[in-house]
């Protein structure tokens, strides 16, 4: 079966699988081969960003959604004039909208630069310092853990086993007296 050529329904020629059920290197049918070839790596630097849904992972669902009703509320019986309430709503909403845009225009790029540098340093330290230190610690602690385990099995296990045997014959009988 190996080495033969097959023609699929579209008339395309492809090589036969190594064995009937296929393997990870050479799948047994064309659809599996197509699935394996479809997997592409996407570069994070060239992917397109969504300009409509700017919070696809919902990071700010609970914290930043502040509307007029979340900040200013008049209880029953204490209401201002309707025109004042509408003007206050419009003023709050427009001010928040444009001031956020102004702050984003002034500080958005510098803050993105600062946070990019910060997370680059954090990633660098995690990859090149933290994980190697933890791995080194785990390797070095194995020696101590073996010695500790031997000491526990030598001294503590017999002691606690003896204490367990002593108290294994203790019987308690409870009676309710009325």
Curated annotation (Swiss-Prot):
Residue numbers of N6-acetyllysine PTMs: 5
Location of N-acetylserine modifications: 2
Entry's Gene Ontology cellular component terms: caveola; endosome; focal adhesion; Golgi membrane; membrane raft; perinuclear region of cytoplasm; sarcolemma
PTM characteristics: Phosphorylated at Tyr-14 by ABL1 in response to oxidative stress. Ubiquitinated. Undergo monoubiquitination and multi- and/or polyubiquitination. Monoubiquitination of N-terminal lysines promotes integration in a ternary complex with UBXN6 and VCP which promotes oligomeric CAV1 targeting to lysosomes for degradation. Ubiquitinated by ZNRF1; leading to degradation and modulation of the TLR4-mediated immune response.
InterPro entries given in the database record: Caveolin, Caveolin_CS
Residues joined by cross-link Glycyl lysine isopeptide (Lys-Gly) (interchain with G-Cter in ubiquitin): 5, 26, 30, 39, 47, 57
Biological process annotations from GO: caveola assembly; cell differentiation; negative regulation of endothelial cell proliferation; receptor internalization; regulation of cytosolic calcium ion concentration; T cell costimulation
Region (Interacts with SPRY1, SPRY2, SPRY3 and SPRY4): 131-142, 167-178
Region described as Interacts with SPRY1, SPRY2, and SPRY4: 149-160
Membrane topology (Cytoplasmic): 2-104, 126-178
Lipid anchor positions (S-palmitoyl cysteine): 133, 143, 156
Pfam family, one: Caveolin
Positions bearing Phosphoserine: 2, 9
GO MF entry, a single one: protein kinase binding
Alphabetic keyword roster: Acetylation, Cell membrane, Golgi apparatus, Isopeptide bond, Lipoprotein, Membrane, Palmitate, Phosphoprotein, Ubl conjugation
Region feature (Interaction with CAVIN3): 82-94
Intramembrane portions: 105-125
Subcellular location: Golgi apparatus membrane; Cell membrane; Membrane, Caveola; Membrane raft
Disulfides per UniProt: none
Subunit structure: Homooligomer. Interacts with GLIPR2. Interacts with NOSTRIN. Interacts with SNAP25 and STX1A. Interacts (via the N-terminus) with DPP4; the interaction is direct. Interacts with CTNNB1, CDH1 and JUP. Interacts with PACSIN2; this interaction induces membrane tubulation. Interacts with SLC7A9. Interacts with BMX and BTK. Interacts with TGFBR1. Interacts with CAVIN3 (via leucine-zipper domain) in a cholesterol-sensitive manner. Interacts with CAVIN1. Interacts with EHD2 in a cholesterol-dependent manner.
Function: May act as a scaffolding protein within caveolar membranes. Forms a stable heterooligomeric complex with CAV2 that targets to lipid rafts and drives caveolae formation. Mediates the recruitment of CAVIN proteins (CAVIN1/2/3/4) to the caveolae. Interacts directly with G-protein alpha subunits and can functionally regulate their activity. Involved in the costimulatory signal essential for T-cell receptor (TCR)-mediated T-cell activation. Its binding to DPP4 induces T-cell proliferation and NF-kappa-B activation in a T-cell receptor/CD3-dependent manner.
Similarity comment: family membership: Belongs to the caveolin family.
Protein name (database record): Caveolin-1
Species annotation: Didelphis virginiana
